[in-house]
């Protein structure tokens, strides 16, 4: 399956890696057959993120970081750092978190 990358994501994530230690975290273990596909996708679009900075886990509550950008509120409720809700059609009704609508907003918030 060829899932497109979000507009400006590659550029902004690359800039973030120049200032922060960035980890890509995916709850992909819920769907174990997707692990290899997700890793190949990551290597295709984000080759500058090494395997040491990719985390596949069952639940993101174990992640200890300063920021978590996620489109699922369930992952943000238990996060102890600053949660940022990335806008997606399934979360438009949620108002519990600071929201970023696109990667340019992430850039402005975390890099300006």
Task: Tell me the role of every PLM-derived stretch.
Residues 22-24, 31-35, 62-64, 75-78, ...:
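Short catalytic/ligand-binding loop motif for oxyanion handling, primarily in non-cytosolic enzymes
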Residues 36-46, 80, 95-97:
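Short, aromatic/basic amphipathic alpha-helical patches
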Residues 21-23, 67, 84:
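A structural signal for isolated positions on well-ordered beta-strands in alpha/beta enzyme cores
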Residues 20, 49-52, 81-82, 97:
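A structural micro-motif
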Residues 51-80:
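Conserved Lys-Pro-Asp/Glu-containing loop-to-beta segment of HAD-superfamily phosphomonoesterases
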Residues 41-54, 100, 104-111:
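Structural recognition of alpha->loop->beta junctions
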Residues 3-5, 9-38, 42:
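Substrate-recognition element of Asp-dependent hydrolases with the DxDx(T/V) motif
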Residues 69-104:
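Acidic, Mg2+-coordinating phosphoryl-transfer loop and its flanking beta/alpha structural elements
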């Amino acid at each position: 399956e060829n899932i497109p990358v979000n507009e400006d994501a590659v550029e902004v994530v690359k800039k973030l890696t120049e200032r922060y230690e960035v980890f890509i975290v995916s709850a992909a273990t819920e769907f174990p057959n997707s692990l290899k596909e997700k890793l190949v996708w990551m290597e295709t679009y984000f080759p500058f993120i090494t395997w040491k900075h990719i985390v596949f886990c069952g639940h993101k509550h174990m992640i200890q970081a300063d920021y978590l950008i996620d489109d699922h509120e369930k992952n943000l409720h238990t996060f102890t750092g600053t949660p940022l809700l990335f806008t997606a059609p399934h979360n438009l009704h949620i108002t519990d978190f600071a929201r970023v609508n696109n990667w340019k907003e992430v850039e402005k918030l975390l890099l300006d």
